[in-house]
């Protein structure tokens, strides 16, 4: 069986509402293993995803308190690069359309200077992918899956801090492949 990136993307989207971060990541890793059998997938399962998600959940609110936008935030974009760099940006509008990021580019947008997440897990995924030669078979899906969980935790924390605000979010690679979190 060859590695089907479309299928793994669909798996991530299908299971995105799993509240147990470690269980979600194990589900994604198991699907990856089915398509690209390799004993080293177990190394990715050993990472402590939940602890870091909890520790980074406050990042968005903390940064926006220091680097406030000049408008009321409505849309949140969590962008990923191919090397596991995850950052966030906010805009004054949001469109919950899986194939459309115009809302982030055609609206007032704020890219906080300190918007990048300092994630050891994302760096560990990249290092393990390189060391085990799983490379993009691990990086693409696990960056996206874990980035999604960081985004969800950040949005949940934001909603706790600002329950009256209606916000939406999406996450994906700057080069494409978007998962829409929707309105919260």
Can you describe what each PLM-predicted range is?
Residues 1-5, 49, 85:
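Charged, low-complexity, helix/coiled-coil-prone segments
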Residues 1-34, 38-44, 69, 123-184:
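Acidic, proline/glycine-rich low-complexity IDRs
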Residues 36-67:
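Contiguous, amphipathic alpha-helical segments that mediate oligomerization or scaffolding
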Residues 58-100, 182-184:
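Amphipathic, interaction-prone secondary-structure segments
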Residues 86-135, 178-184:
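Intrinsically disordered, low-complexity regulatory segments enriched in Ser/Thr/Pro
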